[in-house]
Amino acid sequence: MRFQRRAMTLRQRLMLTIGLILLVFQLISTFWLWHESTEQIQLFEQALRDNRNNDRHIMHEIREAVASLIVPGVFMVSLTLLICYQAVRRITRPLAELQKELEARTADNLAPIAIHSSTLEIESVVSAINQLVTRLTTTLDNERLFTADVAHELRTPLSGVRLHLELLSKTHNVDVAPLIARLDQMMDSVSQLLQLARVGQSFSSGNYQEVKLLEDVILPSYDELNTMLETRQQTLLLPESAADVVVRGDATLLRMLLRNLVENAHRYSPEGTHITIHISADPDAIMAVEDEGPGIDESKCGKLSEAFVRMDSRYGGIGLGLSIVSRITQLHQGQFFLQNRTERTGTRAWVLLKKA
């Protein structure tokens, strides 16, 4: 029959280790004291036999005896403290490893902590953290699934209502254009809710890869973005630089990020204006979208990236575009900035990403 080895607590390890160290050095000190005392007694006896019992000689022998005890005692205490420090450092090493593991994690890394220790407290803390992370992951997954299911269930009836309105307009010559426009806004809002729910699923499965911003993100999105801008006679200008910029991330999410930036510029820019995409790699990767709109109130830039916050309610939307951009940027461990252009009126929205 095999018995499972019982894990020792951190307190027990410290007490046992320090106790053994003190016991060993106490035995050494006792032996040293006995050895020196025996030697001094023999010297005194020899001095008495030789009639060298004058005060000067006695004080000299006393000083030698005290020195022979103090100097080794100081050395032994110092050595004891040093060894105790090394022992405590070795025993608490799992705590330091746990600290490094937690500090190195990003906010989106919800994988279980893989630290194995024979110390009871460390095992309990790691187990509790892993259980908390598991519950948090389950809650977030359920929230994403609920949002995606609700948005998906809304798209089907909205599409049916739009189809019926188009048939009503053709058969009964009824002006339903305002209703169709409102339905289109609702369907766009539902699509954004779906995007917000799905953002991060690729990263949660570790789907990291090298992505070229021009070749894998901007050019594949050009036709879709250009079609969107043509509805308001706007022009999309691509980067002039021939050099591509490579980052590490998810191409699908970065295309979603770019689409939301361009869509936001398209919504708030006048008709017939230009929307420009820039990329650079000095020193980190930058992807920027500039428009020729009225600009923004820079004191409110922090709130504009929050969910359901809009720049201007006159332009429609539900305020999820920049929130999606901010979320995708965080997943790529980057930074999102929003500011007014300096050379002319307009807004510059750009993300700072780490190069591969």
Curated annotation (Swiss-Prot):
Keyword Lipid biosynthesis: no
Induction (UniProt): The eptA-basRS operon is positively autoregulated by BasR under high iron or aluminum concentration conditions.
PROSITE patterns: HAMP, HIS_KIN
Periplasmic side: 35-64
PTM remark: Autophosphorylated.
UniProt cross-references to InterPro entries, sorted A to Z: HAMP_dom (IPR003660), HATPase_C_sf (IPR036890), His_kinase_dom (IPR005467), HisK_dim/P_dom (IPR003661), HisK_dim/P_sf (IPR036097), Sig_transdc_His_kin-like_C (IPR004358), TCS_sensor_his_kinase (IPR050428)
Protein name: Sensor protein BasS
